[in-house]
UniProtKB/Swiss-Prot annotation:
NDH-1 shuttles electrons from NADH, via FMN and iron-sulfur (Fe-S) centers, to quinones in the respiratory chain. The immediate electron acceptor for the enzyme in this species is believed to be ubiquinone. Couples the redox reaction to proton translocation (for every two electrons transferred, four hydrogen ions are translocated across the cytoplasmic membrane), and thus conserves the redox energy in a proton gradient. Keywords: Cell inner membrane, Cell membrane, Membrane, NAD, Quinone, Translocase, Transport, Ubiquinone. This is NADH-quinone oxidoreductase subunit D 1. Its EC number is 7.1.1.-. It comes from Thermodesulfovibrio yellowstonii (strain ATCC 51303 / DSM 11347 / YP87). It holds the Pfam family Complex1_49kDa. Belongs to the complex I 49 kDa subunit family. It is found in: Cell inner membrane. It is a peripheral membrane protein.
Length: 397
């Protein structure tokens, strides 16, 4: 018998932009040789809303709500990042109570975001039960957000100079009760996953990023720390009340999908620890600085015109000039669930930013996908995307 020569057919396929496992409208063009990926080209921009350009026509107060729409899974952190940058620009010192409230809300948003991540990431790989457990617990936190802010996702709760409204004892009691029980819930997730042979096979040794590669790519957050690099904005450049609480920064060793997963699971416990300390140490006092930026409502509901609908800034241009110099620049960052979220603002002596640039961690992390996917199997693409936890609203802005 003559030996038949087997040829491997090369194929180009589109994954997305409507694929459910791309966690948004991400399109990947994959060049395959059999089941091995030879080339991976990510295409982004399908969810571009022009957040940076919109801010140039809005006042500092009016720009706040559009930051909600970037990473919509943790909008509270987006708001805080923008407020921290403007406060740094104008020299506004926020009250201690507002710092602790922001920290509580920020860590609750981190937990919410990580719950969506573990739910969808596990579901992508084949573990469905974790999805039900995680979304159950996230729903309770969203109800707590609604109790204080009136919204579940796009909250617009922080303000330049503090927070919009105070928290009451009912909210603090319910949050404290949840946080005390939450570590046991995290153990439930781990019990369902860590003994799953399919999960371990598809995460250990897959999607490896070395520490040097992670730094060179500009990765931050759990994706960077999973490679063993110690960097957390909350530790290196503390903001709000992070310099007044005790917490650890989880690190991985191998830089694979499993290590990135373990880092986020450990962050669950550290976030609970931070919230518990903040509630126990929450001081009394004001929630808004005296020189905070405010809006002026229309004087009479019977005299509303186009100008009144777009609220004027309470601190007018002349008052802003007391705080900033012409073309002052500032960069401030916060530790978002996905990594370092930075805001670079250029001011030109008016009540509107001359230029705002957002350093979105999802945008940076999307760039590492070719490195992760090329040379791996098609089935590993889904696991790799989930492990870096990108949100396309933040990536495309």
């Amino acid at each position: 018998m003559q030996n038949k020569i087997k040829t491997v057919k090369e194929l180009t396929v589109n994954m997305g932009p409507q694929h459910p496992a791309t966690h948004g409208v991400l399109r990947l063009v994959l060049e395959l040789e059999g089941e091995v990926i030879k080339k991976c080209i990510p295409y982004i921009g399908y969810l571009h809303r022009g957040v940076e350009k919109l801010s140039e026509d809005l006042t500092y107060v009016q720009s706040l709500p559009i930051t909600d729409r970037m990473d919509y899974l943790s909008s509270m952190v987006n708001n805080v990042g923008f407020c921290v940058a403007v406060e740094k620009l104008m020299g506004i010192q926020i009250p201690e109570r507002a710092k602790f409230i922001r920290t509580i809300m920020g860590e609750m948003a981190r937990i919410c975001s990580h719950l969506v991540w573990i739910a969808t990431h596990a579901l992508d790989i084949g573990a469905m039960t974790v999805f039900l457990y995680a979304m159950r617990d996230r729903e309770y936190l969203l109800e707590l957000f609604e109790m204080v802010t009136g919204a579940r996702l796009t909250v617009s709760y922080p303000r330049v100079g503090g927070v919009r409204c105070d928290v009451n004892n009912e909210f603090l009691d319910k949050t404290y009760k949840f946080i005390e029980e939450f570590p046991r819930k995290v153990e439930e997730y781990e019990t369902l996953i860590d003994r799953n042979r399919v999960w371990l096979k598809r995460t250990k040794g897959v999607g490896v990023i070395s520490a040097e590669e992670a730094i060179n790519w500009g990765l931050t957050g759990p994706t960077l720390r999973g490679s063993g690099v110690y960097y957390d904005v909350r530790k290196f450049f503390p903001y709000d009340a992070y310099d007044k609480v005790d917490f650890e920064v989880p690190l991985g060793k191998n830089g694979d999908i499993y290590d990135r997963y373990k880092c986020r699971m450990l962050e669950f416990r550290q976030s609970a620890k931070i919230i518990k300390q903040c509630i126990e140490r929450l001081p009394d006092g004001s929630i808004l600085a005296e020189n905070a930026l405010r809006i002026r409502m229309p004087e009479s509901p019977l005299k509303i015109d186009k100008k009144d609908i777009i609220f004027d800034v309470y601190i007018e241009d002349k008052q802003i000039q007391e705080f900033i110099q012409k073309f002052t620049e500032v960069y401030a960052s916060v530790e978002a669930p996905r990594g370092e979220l930075g805001f670079y603002i250029v001011c030109d002596n008016s009540s509107k930013p001359y230029r705002m640039r957002v350093r979105a961690p999802s945008f940076v992390h999307a760039g590492v996908l070719p490195k992760l996917c090329e040379g791996s199997l098609v089935a590993d693409v889904i696991a790799n995307i989930g492990s870096i936890d990108i949100v396309l609203g933040e990536c495309d802005r």
